[in-house]
Curated annotation (Swiss-Prot):
Name of the protein described by the UniProt record: Chaperone protein DnaK
Record-stated family: Belongs to the heat shock protein 70 family.
Compositional bias annotation for Low complexity: 601-617
Organism expressing this protein natively: Brucella ovis (strain ATCC 25840 / 63/290 / NCTC 10512)
Annotated function: Acts as a chaperone.
Top-level taxonomic group: Bacteria
Any one Gene Ontology molecular-function term assigned to this protein's record: unfolded protein binding
Recorded name of the encoding gene: dnaK
Induction: By heat shock.
Length: 637
């Protein structure tokens, strides 16, 4: 049976794991690392890079390098968070045809789901090269506080990447699964998950294989990226103070500053001070300018203090919704790379009144939990029951624009709730229902998931028709709606037409694009391999020709030289088939050279053998003297 992989699709880094026997195993990528940067780059030559190779060239290609795209997934272009991000990233964020936030590189638009799919493809390839078989099914994690549009967009990304997404699972829940799989005694735990782009906190009761989420809360626009941005802003301000030059509009300098900020942030988790050195950051008429700033841990903590404190409110809300006090939490599990920051650990300890648990790898535990959930769905992992919750209330807009809740937040999923609606006017034949998700009292302040029309209602006085609408949230946290006219018994399955999101046709087109790209990538790889082989043959043939050219006829020598010239010309192009054909032609004509080399070697060996014979015949003239050893004792007797 083919394996189901678990993928932690992160804002900054992604990770893939698979069940290996009874344990989840994190798979190393082609570069030998256990996590892969969630970065996609398009070079000037239209080559697509993913992961570490994309990150390495970011400084020289800021506009073509896409990072932290997860922050845009499922968001509208006019979302205030998108507007904020637009000014901070070097690449272009544009309005998609559906009104969502998309990105643009080299004049081509991509949806965040497409870019995420490219990262998922990289993770899929990583798993396939380890398992030695094709992977088609996956469990993908999302922040617990993701809304329906963001979950749907993540599922779409999986589909574009050629994966059947068996389950979308919340990151803190996945982490709890990996943490508590081998623990039999009952515990109440809090998972504090501060990653690259999002923050979640979940309260769970675990024991005897049952993982029940009691509540969840969070902030989908708070993470390590914000800490980096805060540090970049500080460095820009300090440099301006010192040199009078504003680096804000220099995309190349900003990319270098971002890399340096991330590095400094990581270093300050283990040391009290670091130095940021960026030579030749810019130049003016007086010459090149260098940036050199010493940064202490205390200074960094003061710069990001409000960001750290922003994690406290969701913790309070999660405890309140679970009906618990901080002292009733048995263990606090830290997840996400940002939880390595000492200040974060201090705040967690102060809030929960206990030392946080550090026995899990914060970068890998989510992917491991996803792999375990994959094992559960496949039947390989027995006696595990996962009860998750919906993070946000679901409801509709009623008279006066009020938000009427149908399913409250922190309701265990899957769940179903029905409500009967009627008409507002006589002989009304259609009703428009607008579905929202959120916690505000007015519908307009919440996230519009979409709207649908119930049509074909038989003519009747207002208030008479009885239309039962059922809202159903599946185990992925994705909303489905069905409606039934009680009078006629007619039932409609209604798909919410999201206000944005990708249509089936969009997804189909993107799947085809991804397949075409995979084919193009394969061709490009074949071309590179063919070039490497050809260059190696040219080099070795030229070397042999210089050494043994006098051993072949003038015609053969010319044929070899012509074949080398033809192959060199072919190497200037990208036609892999032509390169292969010319390589084969050179290999064939250079066989004469190989023969000459072989004959020369044999002749040298023959000469060596003759010399050896002469030496042995002269040896025959030497007579070995016989001698007898006499014992000293015998001598004296």
């Amino acid at each position: 049976m083919a394996k189901v992989i678990g993928i932690d699709l992160g804002t900054t880094n992604s990770c893939v794991a698979v069940m290996d026997g009874k344990n989840a195993k994190v798979i190393e990528n082609a570069e030998g690392a256990r996590t892969t940067p969630s970065i996609i780059a398009f070079t000037d030559g239209d080559e697509r890079l993913a992961g570490q190779p994309a990150k390495r060239q970011a400084v020289t290609n800021p506009e073509g390098t896409l990072f932290a795209v997860k922050r845009l997934i499922g968001r509208r272009y006019d979302d205030p968070m998108v507007t904020k991000d637009k000014d901070l990233v070097p690449y272009k964020i544009v309005k998609g045809d559906n009104g969502d936030a998309w990105v643009e590189v080299h004049g081509k638009k991509y949806s965040p789901s497409q870019i995420s799919a490219m990262i998922l493809q990289k993770m899929k390839e990583t798993a396939e090269s380890y398992l030695g078989e094709t992977v088609t099914q996956a469990v993908i994690t999302v922040p617990a506080y993701f809304n329906d549009a963001q979950r749907q967009a993540t599922k779409d990304a999986g589909k574009i990447a050629g994966l059947e997404v068996l389950r979308i699972i919340n990151e803190p829940t996945a982490a709890a699964l990996a943490y508590g799989l081998d623990k039999s005694e009952g515990k109440t735990i809090a998972v504090y998950d501060l990653g690259g782009g999002t923050f979640d906190v979940s309260v769970l009761e675990i024991g005897d294989g049952v993982f029940e989420v009691k509540s969840t809360n969070g902030d989908t626009f708070l993470g390590g990226e914000d800490f980096d941005i805060r540090l970049v802003e500080y460095l820009v301000a300090e440099f301006k103070k010192e040199s009078g030059i504003d680096l804000k509009n220099d995309k190349l300098a900003l990319q270098r500053l971002k890399e340096a900020a991330e590095k400094a942030k990581i270093e300050l988790s283990s040391s009290q001070q670091t130095e940021i050195n960026l030579p030749f950051i810019t130049a003016d008429q007086t010459g090149p300018k260098h940036l050199a700033i010493k940064l202490s841990r205390a200074k960094f903590e003061s710069l990001v203090d409000d960001l750290v404190q922003r994690t406290v409110e969701p913790c309070k809300a999660a405890l309140k919704d679970a009906g618990l006090k901080a002292g009733e939490i048995d263990e606090v599990v830290l997840v996400g790379g940002m939880t390595r920051m000492p200040k974060i650990q201090e705040v967690v300890k102060a809030f929960f009144g206990k030392e946080p648990h550090k026995g899990v790898n914060p970068d890998e535990v989510v992917a491991m939990g996803a792999a375990i959930q994959g094992g559960v769905l496949q039947g390989d992992v027995k006696d595990v029951l996962l009860l998750d919750v919906t993070p946000l209330s679901l409801g509709i807009e009623t008279l006066g624009g009020v938000f009427t809740r149908l399913i409250e937040r922190n309701t265990t999923i899957p769940t179903k709730k029905s409500q009967t609606f009627s008409t507002a006017e006589d002989n009304q034949s259609a009703v428009t229902i607008r579905v929202f998700q959120g916690e505000r009292e007015m519908a307009a302040d919440n996230k519009l998931l979409g709207q649908f029309d119930l049509v074909g209602i038989p003519p009747a006085p207002r208030g008479v028709p009885q239309i039962e609408v059922t809202f159903d949230i599946d185990a992925n946290g994705i909303v489905n709606v069905s409606a039934k006219d009680k009078g006629t018994g007619k039932e409609h399955q209604i798909r919410i037409q999201a206000s944005g999101g990708l249509s089936d046709a969009d997804i189909e087109k993107m799947v085809k694009d991804a397949e075409a790209n995979a084919e193009a990538d394969k061709k490009r790889r074949e071309s590179v391999e063919a070039k490497n082989q050809a260059e190696s043959l040219v080099h070795s043939t030229e070397k042999s020709l210089a050494e043994y050219g006098d051993k072949v006829s003038a015609d053969d020598k010319k044929a070899i030289e012509d074949a080398i010239a033809a192959l060199k010309t072919s190497l200037e192009g990208e036609d892999a088939e032509d390169i292969k054909a010319k390589t084969q032609a050179l290999a064939e004509v250079s066989m004469k050279l190989g023969q000459a080399m072989y004959e020369a070697a044999q002749a040298a060996e023959g000469a060596g053998a003759e010399g050896g014979e002469q030496a042995s015949s002269s040896k025959d003239d030497v007579v070995d003297a016989d001698y007898e050893e006499i014992d000293d004792n015998k001598k004296s007797s």
